[in-house]
Amino acid sequence: MVVDDSAVVRQVVSSVLKSDSEIEVCGAVADPLFAMTRMRMQWPDVIVLDIEMPRMDGISFLKKIMAERPTPVVICSTLTEKGADTTMQAISAGAVEIITKPKVGLKGFLHDSAKVLINAVKAASRANLKPLQRAMASNLKVTPKLSADAVLAEGNTSRLKTTEQLVAIGTSTGGTQALELVLKALPRVSPGIVIVQHMPEKFTAAFAERLDSLCEISVKEAKHKMRVLPGQALIAPGGKHMLLKRSGAQYYVEVIDGPLVSRHRPSVDVLFRSVAQSASGNALGIIMTGMGDDGVKGMLEMRRAGAVTLAQDEASCVVYGMPKEAVKCGAVERSLSLSEIPQAILDCSH
């Protein structure tokens, strides 16, 4: 079901989705109140939802859906700072995917982004919201124990010695909520973390700011040449690749342009390959919930370089895609539930 107050958006989004034989559009309505009436007759598998609408805003509607009958929701948001902030509220309320729409040139943009829209809806249709709801209800806490070629060529791992531990995380669909749960559970004294979360540009800054306000550790959108420090997580900006580099015993990141890798920018494969080359055995790699196979090859390179490699298990994933492919190809040493990941991060620094 498509819920958007713009008749143009409803028409174009419906047309794009109907062009895929695997997708049936059961309705396109102008606001949440119309949607609720239609949904009493036929409940959709996925909802494509605008968040700025008359009569009832998308956030209120989303919270109502999640309370009554949890359903995968794809947010269709404008590329503005206000849109990004509101979208983060929607992600917090349970939305699993984000697609963007400009304020001008809307019709052409949506047609050009047809594949992105179709893939987002298909990923959402595979989402299993129950594990995430259980994890959010349990409010993860950890008590620390006291005792890719187009962007980065394959090469030898660094032989320089450093004892500084580093964590690299890659995730996609369902990852925003999963990352929030993991990072909130970490104490201030934690290893440095670098993260790729598939997300459009302009949204990662708002995502990092939200996490920073919720977590004991510092969370920032990565900037070029920014150092990776203990007690801090850096999130790759949307639309850019992030690579880990090392100068002596210190890690820093490069934020660069480049082609789509594994259909994404930022790409988990690019980050993981750079971690294999710069941190090798001092790294912990974690691949979490998401559709597709981005990060699989990079994680295999990390494991071959001596890093510890972990995957989120099927039972706790919203979409068991990326972790499944990583396990299948032998890139993963162990699979852990979402609730076990924070402790694994702390263990790597001891």
Swiss-Prot record:
Family matches, as CDD domains: CheB_Rec, REC_CheB-like
Residues the record lists as 4-aspartylphosphate modifications: 50
Subcellular compartments: Cytoplasm
Broad class of the protein's primary localization: cytoplasm
EC number: 3.1.1.61, 3.5.1.44
GO molecular function annotations of the record: phosphorelay response regulator activity; protein-glutamate methylesterase activity; protein-glutamine glutaminase activity
BP term (GO), one: chemotaxis
Catalysed reaction, written as an equation: [protein]-L-glutamate 5-O-methyl ester + H2O = L-glutamyl-[protein] + methanol + H(+); L-glutaminyl-[protein] + H2O = L-glutamyl-[protein] + NH4(+)
The keyword Zinc-finger is assigned to this record: no
PROSITE patterns attached to this UniProt entry: CHEB, RESPONSE_REGULATORY
Protein modification: Phosphorylated by CheA. Phosphorylation of the N-terminal regulatory domain activates the methylesterase activity.
Residue span(s) of domain Response regulatory: 1-116
Active site positions: 172, 198, 294
Domain CheB-type methylesterase: start-end pairs: 160-350
Record InterPro entries: CheB-like, CheB_C, CheY-like_superfamily, Sig_transdc_resp-reg_Me-estase, Sig_transdc_resp-reg_receiver
Pfam (any one): CheB_methylest
Keyword set, alphabetical order: Chemotaxis, Cytoplasm, Hydrolase, Phosphoprotein
GO-annotated cellular components: cytoplasm
HAMAP family for this protein: CheB_chemtxs
Protein task: Involved in chemotaxis. Part of a chemotaxis signal transduction system that modulates chemotaxis in response to various stimuli. Catalyzes the demethylation of specific methylglutamate residues introduced into the chemoreceptors (methyl-accepting chemotaxis proteins or MCP) by CheR. Also mediates the irreversible deamidation of specific glutamine residues to glutamic acid.
UniProt record similarity statement: Belongs to the CheB family.
Domain characteristics, as noted in the entry: Contains a C-terminal catalytic domain, and an N-terminal region which modulates catalytic activity.
Protein name (record): Protein-glutamate methylesterase/protein-glutamine glutaminase 1
Gene this protein is translated from: cheB1
